[in-house]
Curated annotation (Swiss-Prot):
Subcellular location: Membrane
GO cellular component labels: mitochondrial outer membrane; nuclear envelope; organelle membrane contact site
Segments crossing the lipid bilayer: 35-55, 92-112
Example of a GO biological process term: organelle localization by membrane tethering
Main location: membrane
Name under which the protein is recorded: Uncharacterized protein YBR063C
Membrane topology: Multi-pass membrane protein
Keyword Transmembrane helix: yes
Length: 404
């Protein structure tokens, strides 16, 4: 501070404790303010002094360079090419001035380039080869649509088989609820497994309990395996209706389960399959294979964890639970069809609640939304056509693993 000519009257600067009366405080503040402005003036004077010196030196250098250029330009051709040093006394000054001027110009150009250059961050989305959903304390809601893919078929026989295969899922609204064993999806969407579930049709009030599965080495011919403790004379009619619609025969085989499955979702046989359909996705000649292949191409999954039973408002602008404002994200290629699905709405789910004698839940722990992750070829994705009629919304499948 002394070198710059600055002063200080702050007693606490040296670490001494002091007490002042009001008059002393005012006088000290006044003197401190005066010294502060004096120091500011000294600093500004120093800055101006060195700035003026720098500007004067810079102007002298520019003037020297200009004089050298004019001097060289005024010489004749013979003097410009002279080699002897004694006749070229100002050559060193010229080179030095030229180098300084080049450095200044280069620095200015590089500064302008740095201001106009912005780094571009690489953006790349991760690619997921496959996605697997395994058993857990979650509920999965599968919304299955019957996509009209007849535009891509030229063979009349294939169209007839396709129409026959969709008879089972041509109802206006179907709700299914039951237990989840495992759901697996791979790149080709060939692995497709359900757990136990009870299917209730809102229109016909029929019940079915079945599972769709495909395992390595399975018989390409369609077959159904039914638990003999479940199938009795009271509920055998729905299975006959399925046999008639898909033109196949179900085979009754015991599965080693001695616990009957309740249609009202209150009792379950843990870890056992009541009905199994084995199929091969590559077998395009079979109606069931065609049906399953179309199902694999056109459904979406929403997962959530719950306390008792599930109640949903679906196909709304922002779907929420009845007693909870927790949103559910509808994923997939069929979000634009929400306004056309008038047959499967809030009132139908309440009707299903009354028939099944379920109790509404007041507390949902948490909700998770899970997209179907699979890489498909563009040609295998069904077309995004709007539904032609209300029967295009074929089924809603709900299954869960256990109560929390």
């Amino acid at each position: 501070m002394e070198e710059l000519g600055l002063k200080s009257t702050f007693p606490y600067e040296y670490g001494s404790d002091f007490t002042m009366i009001r008059t002393e405080m005012l006088n000290t503040t006044k003197s401190e303010t005066t010294i502060l402005f004096s120091n500011i003036k000294s600093i500004l004077a120093i800055i101006w002094k060195y700035s003026f010196t720098f500007l004067r030196s810079f102007s002298d250098s520019i003037k020297l360079i200009i004089d050298d250029v004019v001097t060289i330009g005024s010489r004749n051709f013979a003097e410009r090419l002279q080699i002897e040093a004694k006749k070229n006394n100002d050559q060193e000054d010229i080179w030095a001035s030229t180098i300084i001027l080049g450095v200044i110009i280069g620095y200015l150009i590089s500064s302008i380039k740095r201001k106009n250059t912005f780094p571009i961050m690489p953006t790349s989305s991760p690619k997921i080869d496959d996605c697997r959903f395994k058993t857990g304390d979650t509920i999965s809601i599968v919304i299955n649509f019957n996509e009209d893919c007849l535009n891509n078929r030229s063979d009349v026989t294939e169209e007839r088989n396709y129409e026959e295969s969709t008879v089972l899922h041509s109802k206006e609204s179907v709700l299914s609820i039951g237990r989840q064993n495992m759901v697996t999806l791979n790149q080709s969407d060939e692995n497709f497994t359900y757990g136990n579930f009870d299917e209730y049709d809102l229109l016909t009030k029929d019940y079915t309990t079945e599972v769709l599965t495909r395992s390595p080495g399975s018989n390409p011919e369609f077959k159904a395996v039914v638990n003999n403790t479940l199938l009795d004379s009271a509920n055998e009619t729905p299975f006959k209706g399925i046999e008639k619609s898909i033109n196949e025969t179900m085979v009754k085989v015991p599965m080693g389960c001695d616990v009957s499955l309740s249609h009202y979702g209150r009792q379950y046989a843990p870890g056992n399959i009541s009905i199994m359909r084995s199929f091969t996705a590559r077998d395009n000649t079979k109606s069931v294979s065609r049906e399953i292949r179309d199902i694999c191409k056109s459904f979406l999954i929403i997962k959530s964890q719950f306390g008792d039973e599930l109640f949903l408002t679906m196909f709304m602008e922002k779907p929420v639970f009845f007693d909870n404002n927790i949103p559910i994200e509808i994923t997939g290629a069929y979000r634009e069809k929400r306004e056309r699905l008038d047959e499967v709405i809030h009132k139908d789910l309440i009707r299903y609640d009354e028939v099944q004698n379920l109790t509404r839940i007041r507390n949902l722990l948490r909700v998770k939304s899970q997209k179907i992750c699979s890489r498909r070829h563009n040609s295998s994705v069904p077309t995004k056509k709007l539904l032609v009629n209300d029967k295009g919304a074929t089924s809603i499948l709900l299954w869960y693993s256990n109560y929390s």
